[in-house]
Amino acid sequence: MASALDDPALQRHFKGHKDAVTCVDFSPDSKQLASSSADACVMIWNFKPQSRAYKYPGHKEAVTCVQFSPSGHLVASSSKDRTVRLWAPNIKGESTVLKAHTAVVRCVNFSSDGQTFITASDDKSIKAWNLHRQRFLFSLTQHTNWVRCARFSPDGRLIASCSDDKTVRIWDLTNRLCINTFVDYKGHSNYVDFNQMGTCVASAGADSTVKVWDIRMNKLLQHYQVHNAGVSSLSFHPSGNYLLTASSDGTLKILDLLEGRLIYTLHGHQGPVLSVTFSKSGDQFASGATDAQVLVWKTNFDKYSVKEIVKLQQKRTCPEAPPHLNDIYPRTPHLHSSSGHSIEINPMCEVADTQTFDPPIINVGANLPYCRRTKAVHTLNKHVRNDNYPTPPVAFSYTEGQKEHPLVEEQGVLPPSLSNTLEQIVDQLNVLTQTVSILEHRLTLTEDKLKECLENQQKTSAHASESD
């Protein structure tokens, strides 16, 4: 059993939302925390002592998801109002609006290079967008029901998604095809994510299960039934050794993936927990729930730092490479039962009260005059489908001593002629890439057939020799 010093501890709690907290996300430098809520607001919490929190009203309905860009300069939010907003996480709170889908937008996620982001919606589609040009790229449409979540792999080559059609799908972005499907007949998944190596995905089931799949072998590696209600969210520790889960039963669970067992059960929220996430360094994690609170925890239980674990992984003689399309083939799944016991931690009683006073909250963009649409926003609206949906102009606050700056740099807008030429080149490259992929696949089939023919020839020769 771990010592008390190794147990997770509640560090801070933030109160500012007026309704359920639907999503939480750390900034890349872990100096800020973003949260979204059913109160239709996004909030940015600053960890610096005595700093103010920013509240961004703008969405017309509940905000379903929020995420920092890899650079930390933007925050994306999705909403039931069918839009996605891109915010500057500062006191000015400028935002750009994208009419993204024809139904509720459930999820938004950035690629690791920050060039692309994806959205998932109740319109049964996943859409990819270019961030800097704010241009719609393509849709993935093989799900047959609401898409709850979509996440990039660490290398940006794959997307994992889960839907109310009771499937978890793996998509190859090169071909824009679904290359693998995991079916769960007991219920749909609410959330899905890749581990840090990109070799496994974990799903949070509405049937209260957590499953970890090897996407190279198409095999169920681990199956946990540790919650008493649906699992709403999960997050891999950066080391890849632990998995944090949140559930409607009001608890957070921490799973040791190396030993395949539950090690901690955390009680802190007064109601269903809707979102959890580790910080980039892994030394903190945050949770949000229907009690409108955001809790920030100190990890403590990971005895190795992320840097040490990365060094250990680099020393391996045969590091695991990311999966290739031809590496993924069907296998019969098996269950992995959890073992061991949990350590109950109740922040109200057993953990020292390290909570800070609620920071002052600044309402950014509320009841402010609208400004004229920027060129970037106007350019965006030309390329987004369903333009008949009215897009509000960008609202921002005026603060003395601060210069106005556009959310997206104007220098990123190219002349139409050059833009069309580049698009044609990109389309041609995509065709070439698909052609090469098809040729590789055919070559593989040909090699397999040739190998089979050679084996048959050897068998025939052997039989002929025996007959003689």
UniProtKB/Swiss-Prot annotation:
GO terms, biological process: centriole replication; cilium assembly
GO cellular component, one term: cytoplasm
CDD domains: WD40
WD repeats: 16-55, 58-97, 100-139, 142-181, 184-223, 226-265, 268-307
Tissue/organ expression: Highly expressed in ovary and, at low levels, in testis.
Subcellular location: Cytoplasm, Cytoskeleton, Microtubule organizing center, Centrosome, Centriole
Coiled coil: 420-459
Protein keywords: Cilium biogenesis/degradation, Coiled coil, Cytoplasm, Cytoskeleton, Repeat, WD repeat
Keyword Nucleotide-binding found: no
Coarse class of the protein's main subcellular location: cytoplasm
Keyword Phosphoprotein appears in the UniProt entry: no
Protein family: Belongs to the WD repeat POC1 family.
Quaternary structure annotation from Swiss-Prot or TrEMBL: Interacts with pat.
Role this protein plays: Plays an important role in centriole assembly and/or stability and ciliogenesis. Involved in early steps of centriole duplication, as well as in the later steps of centriole length control.
Name this polypeptide is given: POC1 centriolar protein homolog B
